[in-house]
Amino acid sequence: MWYSNTEDVKAEYADVFYLVSTRIFHEENADGSILYVASNTPEQKAVLSKEMAFVSNNLFPDSLNFFSPFYHQLTLEAAELGSETYNRMSSDVTAEVYESFRYYMDNLNGGRPVVLAGFSQGAFLVKKLLKMMPPEDYSRVVASYSLGCGVNDDDVSTGRIIPAQGADDTGVCITFNSVSDTSAVWPLAMDKCSHCINPVNWTVGAESAEFSYDGQDLTVRLDTSANVLVVDGYKESAPGFNVPWPEGCLHRYEILFYNDYLKSNVLRRVNNFRKSL
């Protein structure tokens, strides 16, 4: 089953294939035992649809076709089991997402360029897809946006994940993670990060950039040692929910902070890619 932004596909431009973040916190059997994979009940799909609708409306230009599969995601409780266990448990989820991508490319894409994007668990799966897809599909990827999941040297060594160096390059991976301090790095999403880009000024250097969110004037800079974004000045206006990441980790804000910058950048890269066809 799919979430899409239009019944009338715009055949002449480009698509977005988006993988939603971890939205299901807890799942259990009838006997009360914990399940670590969501069942995709109607109620759960309604929760996933909220993020899909938000990113379709706020993160991507209206001129792009938007497709997002309802995959059986790992729950947030699975993230508390540690990186090794989480990676092992993700194999079935990865296989399902690849099958969805294969169906999309064979039946829905129509030969158009595609922007591959995901947030959090979705970003983790974006990296998996890039490594798995055949060359003919890879050649049609405008860029990939792995938001809230770091890229490390092992990823880059595959030759399929090429870190973005600016605002205009295509065939690259845009990746970043935000914290208030480098002590707040969340190992599951940010461990061994070797690449990062600042989505406000689109540089891979340490130059600071100013932006606003929730009525607050903020500054963001890339810490080139930890390869994460350090956001100065943000004060949460509402309490957060119970999460397994360190205090000061701004993981939940990756899309909220930067959606305007990302939206214009997606269109910029699509236009550049189409010029090269």
Predicted features and spans:
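Basic, amphipathic N-terminal segments that precede the first structured/catalytic domain
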Residues: 1-7, 12, 45
